[in-house]
């Protein structure tokens, strides 16, 4: 969950956010994930996996 929040803080479409990242309710995260295109999901997952491998 913390990894997801770190990635979301860099998410460019800030106009879709109505609360701070630390206070996001679960349904907002789910709604945001449903809005992502396949390419966006692939990019976020690749960044997340790379950051995990580097640690």
Curated annotation (Swiss-Prot):
Superkingdom of the organism of origin: Viruses
Protein name stated in the entry: Uncharacterized 6.7 kDa protein
């Amino acid at each position: 969950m913390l990894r997801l929040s770190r990635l979301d803080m860099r998410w460019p479409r800030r106009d879709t956010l109505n609360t701070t990242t630390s206070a996001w309710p679960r349904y907002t995260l789910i709604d945001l994930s449903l809005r992502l295109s396949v390419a966006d999901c692939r990019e976020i997952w690749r960044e997340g996996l790379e950051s995990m491998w580097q640690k």
